[in-house]
């Protein structure tokens, strides 16, 4: 399994998680890439809830990623805190879905 990060994701995740916790996230996705919920209209985009130290899953992060099963690759696209944005808007999901369709498939 290959894990690829977008530059945006790298900046975001470095601000949210210490290195050891980020390694746990990567390992969790390598072991079970299907665990994130599929985002409607997201062209295969998945959203994973990930706890931050001291906050748990509910108040933690949302990790947006795309799993290309055939290429055995997980693309880490965006990370955000639930306290800043609870969910994607329909327009955001469509835009990211377009990116996946045009660039990653």
What are these regions (language model features)?
Residues 14-17, 53, 85:
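Amphipathic alpha-helical interaction elements
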Residues 58-63:
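Short, surface-exposed coil-to-beta transition loops
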Residues 8, 19-20, 24, 44, ...:
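Sequence/structural signature of beta-propeller domains
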Residues 1-20:
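Arg/Lys-rich, positively charged N-terminal/basic patches that mediate binding to nucleic acids
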Residues 67-105:
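Enriched for short, Lys/Arg-rich terminal
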